[in-house]
Amino acid sequence: MLERIKDSFTESIQTKIDAAEALPESIAKAAEMMVHCLLGGNKILACGNGGSAGDAQHFSAELLNRYEIERPPLPAIALSTDTSTITAIANDYSYDEIFSKQILALGQPGDILLAISTSGNSGNVIKAMEAALSRDMTIVALTGKDGGAMAGLLSVGDVEIRVPSNVTARIQEVHLLVIHCLCDNIDRTLFPQDEQQ
């Protein structure tokens, strides 16, 4: 059992090393898009299932509250938090529409959808992306494995941040680090700090 625990740490470290080689450009591009969105008076909507729903909420909380520096709140909404809305849509329509209906109501041209799925094949996240495209929103997709069906929905103006792993737990661990990188880049671009602090 101890060896298995150590192996999990080693595998996580190696996945992060691989991601450090593969992902910086796409993370930087996504952060730049988010800064442009926020400066334009728009907002970021985020969605995912399970651990990815937690990641969407984590991202939204970091923007609405703060990441590491004192700054004004930034507009972000996690679409996985309103249980009344989610259960109403799932009950009356289908689970695949729990995010897309919210996007059709809340999304505006210039907004960004942060779509999170370790497999890239979550039906309700795919529907969310389709709804975002119909609202002239830009998409930042956090995926893993081969990118799944989500990768095929992205256009030139969108960004996929695909973790180079096939292991769900490792993908989730890197997704959290990516979210922290995005928040750090957003904060330091919008609110430059003296590096001595």
Curated annotation (Swiss-Prot):
Biological source species: Shewanella sp. (strain W3-18-1)
UniProt entry tagged with the keyword Cell inner membrane: no
Xref: InterPro entries: GmhA/DiaA, Phosphoheptose_Isoase, SIS_dom, SIS_dom_sf, SIS_GmhA/DiaA_subfam
Top-rank EC class of the record's enzyme: isomerase
Protein name: Phosphoheptose isomerase
Cofactor: Zn(2+)
Domain SIS: 34-196
Cofactor: how and how many bound: Binds 1 zinc ion per subunit.
Keywords on record: Carbohydrate metabolism, Cytoplasm, Isomerase, Metal-binding, Zinc
Reactions accelerated catalytically: 2 D-sedoheptulose 7-phosphate = D-glycero-alpha-D-manno-heptose 7-phosphate + D-glycero-beta-D-manno-heptose 7-phosphate
UniProt subunit comment: Homotetramer.
Pfam family, one: SIS_2
PROSITE patterns with a match to the protein in the record: SIS
Family the entry assigns: Belongs to the SIS family. GmhA subfamily.
Localization (cell): Cytoplasm
Function: Catalyzes the isomerization of sedoheptulose 7-phosphate in D-glycero-D-manno-heptose 7-phosphate.
Gene giving rise to this polypeptide: gmhA
